[in-house]
Amino acid sequence: MIYNMKIVIVGDGKVGYTLTKSLSEEGHDLVVIDNNRRILLASQESLDVAVVDGNGASVEVQREAGVDTADLLIAATNGDETNLLCCMVAKKLGCKHTIARVRNPEYDQQIRFMREELGLSMVINPEKAAALEIFRLLQFPSFLKRDSFARGNAEHVELKLKDGNPLIGKPLQQFRTVADVNALVCAVE
């Protein structure tokens, strides 16, 4: 059984709306906060979400949104400082987890401090994350799929061996010797 979370999303712009749409499709209980009533009403009509019109950094607005009983608050406004303040307020109100969108590279050196001192569960810089993902994919262009897990300590990769590859026809016991890698083969098609 999948656990449906109560999630509050602050900011109904491109990032916030995309998150709201995806999480709504997964069946989570969502409340969206934004100070643009027109955009909020459009989201409310097109998605299965509750909305609160107001400043997401406001204690009263967050209370109205039910942050005190939320599993997660995601602050995805265009303002880094607003996002950080939203998360601080949510944590003080009793929200279990908070995620802040922080785009300014000046804050990169302070992320650990922000997580520890401000009680943030995660800080995300979308542009930096996209650049790192592109770099990661370009490192091994032959991989059809590449996913990290265990906090980046392990990876699952999918690749198709081309004709003439020295691994073709070899027993799996010889994989590490022939490929000269420390890997565990999970499946062969």
Regions found by a protein language model. Give the residues of each.
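Cytosolic regulatory regions of ion transport systems
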Residues: 1-189
